[in-house]
Amino acid sequence: MHRSTFLTGSAAALAVRPPKAQTISVADLVYSFPGIIGIYCRTLAPEPPLVAVRASEQFAAASIIKLPIMLTVYRAYERKTATPNDYVTLLPGDITEGAPILGDAHSGQRWPIGTLVEAMIQYSDNIASNALISHFGFTAINATIRSAGMTGTLLARHFAGEVPPGRRNLNVTTPRDIGVLLYAIERGAHEGIPTVASPASCRAMVQLMLGQQYREMIPAGVPRHVPIANKTGELDTVRSDAAIVDPFSEDPYILVLLTRDLEYPGLAYDEIAAFAHRIDAAIVRMDR
């Protein structure tokens, strides 16, 4: 899918603005959305974002904050302070709900780092994520976050099945921050240059994300033949997704959709897919 003509964005107008004064609005979707949504979308071109709605506002990160944890791991691989075959011992505090791969695991078990990263990204396994947080540490992960230019993002707690209301928003991020991270990863992979990691690490992270098992949001709004490397995040009133769309094409793009205060969380999947469909269709039309 060729996407060589780019759009420009305006948060104030809540619209996708392609060149030549045409406007493809997303305002109707934003205003009818049953909650609060933040959007960030851009291509690899050195242009303003295609769409930027609440792009710098903080949202509960949910599992999307597992992306900078992944980056921390791959940077450790590059420094040779860790390898995918190194084993991590599960601690009592790592055990929690939301673990489709490590659900039967118990403290004291040992798991390879490579297996933990795959479970964290592709299955959003919380025990795997907690084990990586415990192993690499909050300080190192937040240093990765800062060095990637993610100024509105913070990892402040482990993942838990039931989170008290006052602690739900301790892990925070912004649509722009996640977009900046995915842009850097895709640019490194696509252009073969060092960005937040080496080109080889960036390609490996894209490949890992392409194995994502949860495809109900952004992927559901894009034609099925288009490859999508994405990471989802969910809390009780949060459904979010962040993706590199068509990462191997001439014109990949980044799309981040973060939400909060959803009135009907179960219906948000289709709503988010509708945003993805609108934006993707706009990009394709402008390429004709």
Which ranges hold each PLM region?
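N-terminal export signals
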Residues: H2-A21
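Structured C-terminal helix/loop/strand segments within mature extracytoplasmic catalytic/sensor domains
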Residues: T5, Q22-D28, F33, L50, ...
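Beta-lactamase-like hydrolase cores
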Residues: P18-A60
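Extracytoplasmic
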Residues: P34-I36, R54-S56, A62-I64, T83-N85, ...
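Mid-domain, small-residue-enriched loop/turn segments at the edges of structured enzyme/sensor domains
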Residues: I36, N130-H190
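Active-site SXXK
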Residues: A60-V88, M120, L255
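Active-site helix/loop module of the DD-peptidase/beta-lactamase fold
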Residues: T81-W111, A140-A160
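Conserved catalytic neighborhood of penicillin-recognizing serine enzymes
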Residues: I95-N130, F138, N171
